[in-house]
Amino acid sequence: RRQRQMCIRDRAYCFAAEKHCNQKRRSGEMYINHPVEVAIILADLKMDCDVVCAALLHDTVEDTETSLADVSGLFGDTVAELVDGVTKLTNIEVDSMDEKQALTLRKMFLAMSKDIRVIIVKLADRLHNMRTLAALREDRRLFKARETMDVYAPLADRLGMSSIKWELEDLSFFYLEPDAYQRIARMVAESREVRE
């Protein structure tokens, strides 16, 4: 069984790498690095094979000529449903992020996801995007950071994914309040030196 899962994951990686082969991220790095990093986050969380495969394939339907039927035929209905769910969540657009809008978005995410693993893949996707946020324009960085703080971190908290929640909040705070972030980082470093 383990051998079969490794084979499926390898096929998912090869398929995604081929589909994204000519694409680059805004940072200039090869696009395939993003789904691989998302898959690594989920593998580290001990998520199942279907989730890791969906992470590898999560942008193929949205950003390449791949159809959901292609994903289903090659990797099964469960993986295809996860990919479809992540794609639908990704396509929810908001123009502003006030508290009411954030609450509505969190509720919409939960209502749209028949399988909670869709949200888990989306959280890992957002986490990697936050780790690489510097490549975006400042206005987009600030919007993504606010959206992450108000929508994604509370979702991670609600799902009991505290390590993801903390990192999402930390990365958001870095962009939203850079002076306060640096001040706190200095205090933590000084405190660490005193303890050592």
Q: What do these predicted ranges mean?
A:
Residues 1-5, 9-196:
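Active-site helical microenvironments for divalent-metal-assisted chemistry
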